[in-house]
From Swiss-Prot:
Optimum pH is 6.0 for phosphorolytic activity. Optimum pH is 5.0 for the synthetic reaction. It is an enzyme of class 2 (transferase). Gene3D superfamilies: Glycosyl hydrolase domain, family 43. Homodimer. It catalyses: [(1->2)-beta-D-mannosyl](n) + phosphate = [(1->2)-beta-D-mannosyl](n-1) + alpha-D-mannose 1-phosphate. The keyword Cytoplasm does not apply. Its EC number is 2.4.1.340. Keywords: Carbohydrate metabolism, Glycosyltransferase, Transferase. This is 1,2-beta-oligomannan phosphorylase. GO terms for molecular function: glycosyltransferase activity. Pathway: Nucleotide-sugar biosynthesis; GDP-alpha-D-mannose biosynthesis.
């Protein structure tokens, strides 16, 4: 059975009081291991989601580490709410690198009308300077990522049309087609209410290893795992019945949104997967999985 092992019982990244934009929470981070370093693009807020004053706005910060645990960070965000679609912020980024370019999908939250959240895309050559490419799908949608390489010459995206995980294909990153659901909630289980992806899929010899999040009827968020076919990733070839990580530590159970472990990023170094996750929508933790232990 696949289980994640926490590298630390403490968060690896916490809010920073002296930086106003990230003084309340840091969570739900993208992650990638590249050029010998662990890179995070993390979501941060200046107030809590239930604050009686001000607006809850998410921005994206950057942190870097040599060992995956001890991080240095920039004092200013790398992306802030600068467009109409981002009036209330940029949420839950996920990053892949294809042909030397970093592609980041994130949720732009406009809050101009009901369900005003959209998948957005930005690109970068250095993880610091980002160029917005705009809205990917003009519909209420979130939890999206590209696969880290083209499959059969096409870009492939996972996204979330509530309450399922969907897949879609594109030739140009603008026009998406062949949308279909690939993973659905299972009634009366830990994944009964909704499912959505964690970080981008990871290529293994047996298939695309995908970590996903799921909520139950009590809004407890856990992480699960599936394996997708290498050539046709719309096919789920294995799905573990049990979660691979669930809220157990104090900072996973208590925070702005209690009982949540929620991942947006995996950093693969050698044969170890570092899974970064938000704890209770307040701090960031990390757990690992050895590639050899991916056994369904």
């Amino acid at each position: 059975m696949i289980k994640l092992k926490r590298l630390s019982d403490k968060p690896v990244l916490m809010p920073k009081a002296e930086n106003e934009w990230e003084r309340a929470a840091v969570f739900n981070t993208a992650a990638i291991y590249d050029n010998g370093l662990f890179h995070l693009i993390y979501r941060a807020t200046d107030i809590g989601p239930h604050a009686k004053y001000g607006k809850y706005i998410s921005r994206l910060g950057y942190a870097v580490s040599k060992d995956g645990i001890n991080f240095m960070r920039l004092d200013k965000p790398v992306m802030s709410n600068e467009t109409e679609q981002e009036l209330r912020g940029l949420e839950d980024p996920r990053i892949v690198k294809i042909d030397g370019i970093y592609y980041m999908m994130y949720t732009g939250f406009g809050d101009r009308f009901q369900d005003d959240y959209r998948i957005c895309l930005a690109t970068s050559k250095n993880l610091i300077d980002w160029e917005r490419k705009g809205v990917v799908l003009d519909e209420p949608n979130k939890d999206a990522s590209l696969f880290p390489e083209k499959i059969n010459g096409k870009y492939v995206m996972l996204h979330r049309r509530y309450p399922d995980i969907w897949i879609a294909f594109s030739d140009d990153l603008k026009n998406w087609y062949d949308h279909k659901p690939i993973l659905k909630p299972i009634p009366n289980t830990w994944e009964s209410a909704r499912v959505g992806i964690g970080g981008p899929p990871i290529k293994t010899k047996d298939g695309w290893f995908l970590i996903y999040h799921a909520a139950d009827d009590n809004n407890v968020y856990r992480l699960g795992a599936v394996l997708l076919d290498l050539e046709d990733p719309s096919k789920v070839i294995a799905r573990q019945k049990e979660p691979i990580l669930e809220p157990e530590l104090g900072w996973e159970k208590e925070g702005y949104i209690p009982n949540v472990v929620f991942s947006c990023g995996n950093a693969v170094k050698d044969d170890t997967i570092y899974v970064y996750y938000g704890g209770a929508d307040t701090v960031i933790g990390v757990a690992i999985l050895e590639m050899k232990d991916i056994k369904f």
